[in-house]
Amino acid sequence: LILKWEDHADEPHSDRWLVLIMYMTGLSIGVHLLNLLCLPAIVLVYYYRKCPQPDSRKDLYGSIAALVISVVILGAVLYGLVPGIVRVGGWFELLFVNVFGCPFNTGEIVYIILLIATLVWAIYESYKDQSLKRQNIAFLLSVAMLGIPFFGYGWSAVLIGIVVLALIWLVLQYKRQGKLLITSRIKNTSLLCMMMLLIGYSSYAVIVIRSAANPPMDQNSPEDIFTLGDYLARDQYGQRPLRSEER
């Protein structure tokens, strides 16, 4: 698919191939996480197509920068979005059930509705390109609702998330030679990619539906958002040391 994009990279609607790639990436997460290792190669193809460098030294530095960006994207998907959606959904569930006294699964429903509404609003703002402030606020809210910046657990995840969101805000405001480094088209494409990645990743809902039927084989019994988090963390497989000590 990235080679298909390369053939049409100069066309106005070439970004649709990137959006399709992210949808396939979301689906591949449900098959095996090693599929995410395709992302560095995809980023390199994108860089070489968009930023050809005649100077070999500049090309080397650009390739290293592209690899660093690909690692950041890989970490954002693997350690941010994949566990982050479940983590933020769990926070909503605890808030609505333990604090507000609502029935079970109320927080999850509210979270899903707010997540969809935030993504739609952010995509609309980046498409219309009328207010930079609203664009950036909607973009940050979308990233936060997807749980991408919240690495770790407890209050440490919240603090790390605040720092990451502040850094993203600075990047969104950064200008080079009087022009924004992150244009509205980049934000719009990024939001569409995150939305399609979420749609592909939602195939994990089948796990919860299957577990609710109580089949004979039901490891970790992921019937709610908290046990689903344990299931996604592969806690059902236990741990085994890489080096066994002889006794």
Describe each region flagged by the PLM:
Residues H8-G26, D55-V72, L132-A144:
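Short hydrophobic alpha-helices at membrane interfaces in multi-pass membrane enzymes
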